[in-house]
Swiss-Prot record:
It is an enzyme of class 5 (isomerase). Its EC number is 5.3.1.29. Substrate binds at residues 22-25, 65, 137-139, 214-215, 240. It comes from the Archaea. GO terms for biological process: L-methionine salvage from methylthioadenosine; pentose catabolic process. It catalyses: alpha-D-ribose 1,5-bisphosphate = D-ribulose 1,5-bisphosphate. This is Ribose 1,5-bisphosphate isomerase. GO terms for molecular function: ribose 1,5-bisphosphate isomerase activity; S-methyl-5-thioribose-1-phosphate isomerase activity. The keyword Iron-sulfur does not apply.
């Protein structure tokens, strides 16, 4: 008999796949919540049965989005603690409590990290700054909102972020706080870089050498910022650092459906020898980045390895908690 997985786990997994749940931080908090719901609603009669369910739920969630490392790092946070409890002979209710408590702890820490990044990053924003941003990052928005709330006169240039228009979400959110916003097409980034003082963007994953994997278009903005000698600041929680890259693993870049770029009905009329490629992310080399703002402080890109060793060194010693 297979593991009994609650409906909410499948629903959250599907929402992550379809990008109804989007953004690395929100994805991470959602998978932690999914494990918590599995533990809360499970009808397992033994710790062994619950542990089997948790592993199966984690596998379902793990397969949804390959690039955003926040997802497996959230799973690791909860499942590693659950595995320690299970391996130590915890009874059913103790194991259930461990999962629920660990998930709540992760979600709380994640939300606090965004606040802290805002406080730290705002110190680098000056009165009168024009800031450019790309896609939709809660951490990056926290930096800009905190600076604005401190009374700094700022204006934000928001790129549309094709093909899914996440820039619209960012523009509306910033405007709702009272921040003046200029909304531009992605290809206008270089044109408006000459009036930009700082670039503040988020990250989906950060590698051991300090490279940043983020929404497609990020690297072009960072490149043109370097050309114009404009500071590039990446705002990212430490759970977005990618532990496997310490062992040489490359980050898989997710390829999404061509119909996100060209509507399906139109695409059917196109010549068959035209391929539409739709990578969701690109890689920005560390030399295009000035600083990474984390909840632990501001670091240069080359110090990413230190964060990884401190936060995830333990993860390299074991198989994934849901694999054995």
């Amino acid at each position: 008999m297979g593991a009994m997985i609650v409906r909410e786990v499948y629903e959250i997994a599907e929402k992550i796949k379809s990008m109804e749940i989007r953004g690395a931080g929100k994805i991470a908090r959602s998978v932690a919540q999914a494990l918590m719901i599995q533990a809360e609603k499970s009808t397992a009669k033994s710790p062994e049965e619950l542990w089997t369910e948790l592993k199966e739920a984690a596998k379902i969630l793990y397969k949804t989005r390959p690039t955003a490392v926040s997802l497996p790092n959230a799973l690791r946070y909860v499942m590693h603690r659950a595995k320690i409890a299970y391996s130590s002979g915890a009874d059913l209710e103790t194991l259930r409590f461990t999962v629920i408590n660990s998930a709540k702890e992760f979600i709380h820490n994640s939300e606090k990290a965004i606040e802290r990044i805002g406080e730290i990053g705002a110190k680098r924003i000056e009165d009168g700054d024009v800031i450019m941003t790309h896609c939709h990052s809660k951490a990056a928005i926290s930096v800009m909102k905190t600076a604005f709330d401190q009374g700094k006169d700022i204006k934000v240039i928001v790129t549309e972020t094709r093909p899914r228009w996440q820039g619209k979400i960012t523009a509306k959110e910033l405007a709702s706080y009272g921040i003046p916003v200029i909304y531009v097409v992605d290809s206008a980034a270089r044109h408006y870089m000459k009036m930009t003082d700082k670039v503040v963007m988020g990250a989906d994953s950060i590698t051991a050498n300090g490279a940043v994997i983020n929404k497609i278009g990020t690297s072009l903005i960072a490149l043109t910022a370097k050309e114009h000698r404009v500071w590039v600041m990446i705002a990212a929680e430490t759970y977005k650092f990618h532990p496997e890259t310490m062992l040489g693993q490359l980050v898989e870049i997710e390829m999404r459906d061509p119909t996100e770029v060209i509507p399906e009905e139109e695409l059917k009329t196109w010549p068959k020898n035209i391929e539409v490629w739709n990578p969701a992310f690109d890689v920005t080399p560390p030399e295009y980045i000035d600083v990474i703002i984390t909840e632990k402080g501001i670091i240069p890109p080359y110090a990413a390895i230190d964060i990884l060793k401190e936060e995830f060194g333990w993860a390299l010693k074991y198989r994934e908690p849901w694999e054995d």
